[in-house]
Amino acid sequence: MDLPINLTSFSLSTPSTLEPNRSLDTEALRTSQSFLSAFRVLVLTLLGFLAAATFTWNLLVLATILRVRTFHRVPHNLVASMAISDVLVAVLVMPLSLVHELSGRRWQLGRRLCQLWIACDVLCCTASIWNVTAIALDRYWSITRHLEYTLRARKRVSNVMILLTWALSAVISLAPLLFGWGETYSELSEECQVSREPSYTVFSTVGAFYLPLCVVLFVYWKIYKAAKFRMGSRKTNSVSPIPEAVEVKDASQHPQMVFTVRHATVTFQTEGDTWREQKEQRAALMVGILIGVFVLCWFPFFVTELISPLCSWDIPALWKSIFLWLGYSNSFFNPLIYTAFNRSYSSAFKVFFSKQQ
C-alpha cells in the first residue's frame, strides 16, 4: 500500500533551502558593486590628480621661461610651445574627458560642446606630438651640424617649426567642422567621439601620429649613428698604453738612432670637445627618453584609432578609456623629462621660487 505524500512539509522545506543561497548571491553582488564603485572613485580621483599635475608642472615651465631672461631664445621657445599645448590639454581636454568618464562615456552636454571638445582634443594633442618632434629635430641638427646650425639659423628654423606645428594641428582638428568630414556627435546614442569616417581617420592619424613617429625614429637613428661615429673617431685619434716597450729604428737615415716608447698615450681631444661630447650625450639621452615615452603613451591609442573604423571593430569602452588617458599622460611626462636633463632649469626653478618668497 502506497504511503501518502506529505505535501505540506515538502512545500515548506523547499524555500528554506533556497533562501540562504539567494541571500548569499545578493550579498556577493552588493560587495562586488561596492568594490567596483570604490575602484571607480579611486581611478577618477587619480585622473583628476593627473590633470592637475599636468597643468601645474607645464605652467611652472612656462612661468620660468617667461621670468628668466636667458631662456628667451632657442631651444626654449620650442619647450614653451610644447608646454602651451600640454597646458591646453590639461585645461580644455582633460576636464571634459573626466566628465565623460563620470557619465559612463555618455555625452549629455549637447552637440556644440561636443564639437568644441573634440576639436580642442585633436588640436592640443596633435600640437603636443609635433612639438616633441620639433624638439627632437632641433637636437638632431644641433648635434650633427653644430657649425652650420648657428644661433640665427636655429631661431629661424624653430619659429618655422612652431608655426607649422600649430597650423597643421589646426587643419587636422577643424577639418570635420569646415568640410563636413564625418560626424562627431550622435544624439540618439549619446556618443561624442572623433569622426569615424575612414578617409578622415587615415588623414588624421597619419598627420597627427604616424608621420611624426617616422620623423622621430629616423632622427634618433641618425643621432645614434652620429654618436657611434664620434666614439669611433675618438678611438682612432688616441694611442692606448702598451704593456711592453717598443723600439723604432730608422735604418735608412740614422742607423744609430733608437726611439723607445713605454706606456705612451696620445690623445687629440681638447677640454672643449669633452664638454661638448658630454652635452651631446645628455641631449641624445633626453631625446631618446622623450621619444620612447611618446611612443609608449600614444602608440596603443592610434593603432586602435586607425584599425577600429577601417575594420568595423569596436573595442571595449574600458580599453578606449585606458588608451586615451595613457595618451593624455604624455603631456605630464614631457616637461618632467625635458627639465630633468637640463641643469639650467633646476637652477632657474630655485631662482624663481626664491623671488616668489
Curated annotation (Swiss-Prot):
Disulfide bonds join 114-192. Residues 64-76, 138-155, 221-287, 340-357 are cytoplasmic. The chain crosses the membrane at residues 37-63, 77-103, 115-137, 156-176, 199-220, 288-312, 315-339. GO terms for biological process: adenylate cyclase-activating G protein-coupled receptor signaling pathway; adenylate cyclase-inhibiting serotonin receptor signaling pathway; chemical synaptic transmission; G protein-coupled receptor signaling pathway, coupled to cyclic nucleotide second messenger; hippocampus development; response to estradiol. This is 5-hydroxytryptamine receptor 5A. InterPro entries: 5HT5A_rcpt, 5HT_rcpt, GPCR_Rhodpsn, GPCR_Rhodpsn_7TM. Glycans are attached at residues 6, 21. The gene is Htr5a. Residues 1-36, 104-114, 177-198, 313-314 are extracellular. GO terms for cellular component: dendrite; perikaryon; plasma membrane; postsynaptic specialization membrane. It is a multi-pass membrane protein. Keywords: Cell membrane, Disulfide bond, G-protein coupled receptor, Glycoprotein, Membrane, Receptor, Transducer, Transmembrane, Transmembrane helix. It is found in: Cell membrane. G-protein coupled receptor for 5-hydroxytryptamine (serotonin), a biogenic hormone that functions as a neurotransmitter, a hormone and a mitogen. Also functions as a receptor for ergot alkaloid derivatives and other psychoactive substances. Ligand binding causes a conformation change that triggers signaling via guanine nucleotide-binding proteins (G proteins) and modulates the activity of downstream effectors. Belongs to the G-protein coupled receptor 1 family. GO terms for molecular function: G protein-coupled serotonin receptor activity; Gi/o-coupled serotonin receptor activity; neurotransmitter receptor activity; serotonin receptor activity. It holds the Pfam family 7tm_1. Central nervous system. Serotonin binds at residue 121.
